[in-house]
Structure formats: structure tokens, C-alpha cells
Amino acid sequence: NNPFTFGSAEALTQLLVSLMPASDGANSIFADKAQALISGVMYALVDLRDKGLLKLSTSIIRDSLALEKCVALALHPELDEESRASIQAALGTSGWIAGREMKDQPPSFAEQFGYAQSYFGKALSSLTDTYRHIYGAEDGEVDFADAIMQRRILVVLLPSLEKAPAELASLGKISLSAIR
């Protein structure tokens, strides 16, 4: 089931933040920028999803985290002012200056953006490529709301012999978050 079909921008942001690798010391500033970036992107994407302009999935999120696409998303004409302000503020934490062409942005912008973007590379790659058949489905077969409301038994199998413990933990977090 695609956990990004439903849910608020904040809930989906927290789902992705929970998959970030731990950072400490000097790297915590980059982790903070990564959280700001994914928050801004999720507010914009959820806004477009709720307007029926796109079906949100892990591949859409991963594609939207490319520098040029993220800037284009910040300038999307269909965004609400709040969503636009959120993603533009997130880009601003990496040095983006609104109103300037990409070629006129500060040289450090692309570098700082890349650091923030890299925090989600592994998780989104895993969800989009390895588990596309599960999390990439636009309309999944499992209705988690029905399972909860009708008190049905739902079993999620994790490939414990085939994956590293950290990968299994990520899959478990995603499954639990999808149920919420």
C-alpha cells in the first residue's frame, strides 16, 4: 500500500524523517536542513495531491528532490501561499534566493542542497526501486483503515534473512506509519 496516498504533510514528513540516518555533532546542521527541505517539499506535494493534480508516491517524492525540480515545485502556480512559503523557506535554508534564475544563485546553493537531499537518498531509493511493487502502487490492495475499523488481522511479512537489521527497522517503521 502506498503510505503517501493519504495523510497530512506533517505526518508524511515525520515518516520520512524517521528513515533518516542518525547524525551527530557537526553533521546535525545538515540533518536540520534536510528536515526543513523534506518538510517544505511534502507541504507542496500534499497540496498538489489534495487538489487532484498528482498521485503522490515515493518516486514522485524522489524526483521532486532533484534541485531543478524542487525549485520548479517552489514556483508551481497551483500551490497555496502557505505551501509556496514553506518550500521557498526550505530552499532558503540552503541559500536559494527567490526571484533569481538558477544560474544566478549563489555557488554554495547546489552544494548545500545536495547535502540536505542526500539524507533521503538511501531510504527513497529502497522504497522506490526495491519495494516499488509495494509502496509504488497508486492504489494498493490493502486498505489499512478497513483493517483497523473492521478489527481484521493484518500480517506484514518482513524479509528478515535477506535484509540488514537497519533495513528491516525502516520497513517496519513504514508499515506502522502507513497504518496510522
Residue ranges and their predicted role:
Residues 1-180:
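P-loop NTPase motor domains
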